[in-house]
Amino acid sequence: MKHLDLFSGVGGFSLAASWVWGKDHEVVCFCEQDKFCQKVLNKHWPNVPIVEDVNDVERIVTYTKRLGRWERGNTQTERNTEEVVMARQEPAERTRPDTGTDSAITLLSAGVPCQPASVAGKQSGTRDDRWLWPQTFDVVRAVRPRWCLFENVRGLLSLEGGMVFKSLLSELEAIGYEVWCFVLPACAKNAPHRRDRVWIVAHSKLWEDNGKR
């Protein structure tokens, strides 16, 4: 199980995934700019590369190349990456879903920065320079993971009357993903506070998984 971990923090997603998949779990790459977090990641996953900037799509994709993903000459995937990096078109115009299912990445996780949506802040949403959902989806388009898992604050649901959240889901669906959404409080896992969080789970329609999810 190959895992690409964006906005990794101190590795919570990767730690949880290792509990689930055990020895079958392998982190391919972290994306994290905080220096303290990088030290923690290097301590616990010393051989896993860290990319600091989520805008560096090409560098992130190189770590999927090392898994042999492009050995079969997936020209559609190459075009996807070129469009994302060079063209920067509007989301709906950037790419069409791949026609193949050779992505080496099983899971892409992302704790996308929550400050633009948090009710503790100004909820500037897409006007905030920390709004990094477009960059996250650029990586999704280029890598085409089988599964995506995103986490954010509940305030994401109410930005611009809910239109921003609907747009995020529509963009995932437009590039070939089936999407499920949940709001789960931390107290559901016995934490001593509520702390509601939005979870978005997306599965590539290109992977049938023998009818199983």
Where are these regions (language model features)?
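SAM cofactor-binding core of SAM-dependent methyltransferases
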Residues: K2-E58
